[in-house]
Amino acid sequence: MAKDNIHPNWYPEAKVYCDGQLIMTIGSTKPELHVDIWSGNHPFFTGSQRIIDTEGRVERFMRKYKINKN
């Protein structure tokens, strides 16, 4: 038995926007959701993911502990 007037409103057609563009509609407690990243533009899901290794962790480790590559 749910209590009256304590539960948030449910919006079954809440709109999700990314960069001002409508992405999808979902059920939510807010009528509109604005997101920065979603599966359509996330590098992992789009296949454009790059491994960023600015200094080279292995090289930095080897230099720190004075290990020579053979």
Curated annotation (Swiss-Prot):
Keywords, comma-separated and alphabetical: Chloroplast, Plastid, Ribonucleoprotein, Ribosomal protein, RNA-binding, rRNA-binding
One GO process term, biological-process aspect: translation
Residue spans crossing the bilayer: none
Broad class of the protein's primary localization: plastid
Molecular-function GO term, any one: rRNA binding
Plastid listed as a keyword: yes
Record's subcellular location: Plastid, Chloroplast
One of the record's GO cellular component terms: chloroplast
UniProt similarity note: Belongs to the bacterial ribosomal protein bL31 family. Type A subfamily.
Role this protein plays: Binds the 23S rRNA.
NCBIfam families: L31, PRK00528.1
Oligomeric form and interacting partners: Part of the 50S ribosomal subunit.
Protein name as annotated: Large ribosomal subunit protein bL31c
Source organism of the structure: Pyropia yezoensis (Susabi-nori)
